[in-house]
């Protein structure tokens, strides 16, 4: 078996890092995790527009990011021996191929195509929700009101989840845990961070995600991850507490 090393940003905040980490962990893969930090994310950002504005912050140079293990400037990156795989969904695809017994995609071809479709929708969509509801596993923001555009994204997520669960019968989107669930886990986390009520049709799904051993392990690992100033400052600017949901 090749050596697997997943290079991530802090699992406290990085939704793109959480996704393949969950897929690999659920699959039972043996892999090491290396956490890197980007210098520009420890600076002071502008939050006056209700989002994280990095316009006036000089980004960490591409050469520095590559020195940390990136391929094209972003993280995560999975190294299979010395071969890098970048992009979260591609890493999840590798996990599905390398560990077929984990069932990370549905067996039925049509359901597998649907699972891939909603995973791709997560990659390319929901821009307003991602901008306004910055991912923060342990933070909580009381009294938060999403913008109209963000609410549209939230409504679409509930529509999508409800349709999948009605068809599959649960407990996960396609019956058993799949890459689709890994892709949407950070959305569930975001909704909790900002106090967005869950649609009644997805309450049991949320509980099934909470009970998943890979998710419980992620929360345990993430609480020890390095802090990112910009994300903590953003929650404070909204009147929130970055540590409100820390265990213990």
Indicate residue ranges for each PLM-predicted region.
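GST-like domain detector, emphasizing the conserved glutathione-binding G-site
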Residues: 1-146
């Amino acid at each position: 078996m090749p050596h697997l090393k997943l290079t991530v940003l802090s699992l406290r905040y990085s939704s793109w890092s959480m996704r393949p980490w969950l897929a690999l962990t659920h699959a039972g893969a043996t892999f090491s995790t290396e956490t890197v930090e980007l210098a520009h994310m420890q600076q002071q950002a502008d939050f006056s527009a209700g989002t994280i504005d990095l316009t006036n912050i000089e980004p960490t140079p591409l050469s520095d990011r590559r020195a940390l293990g990136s391929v094209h400037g972003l993280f995560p990156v999975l190294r299979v021996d010395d071969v890098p795989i970048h992009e979260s969904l591609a890493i999840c695809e590798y996990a599905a191929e390398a560990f077929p017994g984990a069932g990370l995609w549905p067996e039925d071809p049509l359901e597998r195509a649907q699972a891939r479709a909603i995973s791709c929708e997560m990659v390319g969509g929901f821009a307003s929700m991602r901008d306004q509801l910055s991912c923060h596993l342990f933070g909580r923001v009381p009294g938060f009101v999403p913008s109209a555009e963000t609410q549209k994204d939230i409504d679409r997520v509930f529509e999508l989840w409800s349709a999948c669960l009605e068809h599959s019968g649960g407990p996960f989107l396609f019956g058993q845990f799949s890459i689709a669930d890994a892709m949407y886990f950070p959305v569930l986390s975001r909704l909790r961070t900002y106090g967005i009520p869950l649609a009644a049709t997805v309450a049991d799904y949320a509980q099934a995600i909470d009970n998943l051993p890979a998710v419980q392990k992620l929360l345990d690992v993430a609480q020890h991850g390095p802090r990112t100033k910009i994300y903590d400052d953003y929650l404070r600017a909204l009147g929130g507490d970055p540590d409100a949901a820390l265990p213990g």
